[in-house]
Amino acid sequence: MANVYDLANELERAVRALPEYQAVLTAKAAIESDADAQVLWQDFLATQSKVQEMMQSGQMPSQEEQDEMSKLGEKIESNDLLKVYFDQQQRLSVYMSDIEKIVFAPMQDLM
């Protein structure tokens, strides 16, 4: 029987070799080489982190914060580089979701 850690490492390498993973890397590099896209990306990450912290503490974003997030979403949608990045992330997430179901199936059997 193969070592479970060896199999996990093999899975990691297989994910990195997926064309969808490579497409996300390419899209990320494009964002990093464009100043406008990079600023929007950093704003998105900061906003996402702020909202997650609020929700974890049981708070909801104010109307003003929701409006800011909506405006940021519109800016992101209008930036071709970020749009491509999120589209590629979505394609990759399909694989990751399927893999997660497979890997966690034994745990479901125990519940």
UniProtKB/Swiss-Prot annotation:
Protein name: UPF0342 protein SAK_1409
Organism (species): Streptococcus agalactiae serotype Ia (strain ATCC 27591 / A909 / CDC SS700)
NCBIfam families registered for this protein in UniProt: PRK13676.1-1
Family in the record: Belongs to the UPF0342 family.
Gene3D superfamilies: YheA/YmcA-like (1.20.1500.10)
Annotated InterPro entries: Com_YlbF, YheA/YmcA-like_dom_sf
Lineage: Bacteria, Bacillati, Bacillota, Bacilli, Lactobacillales
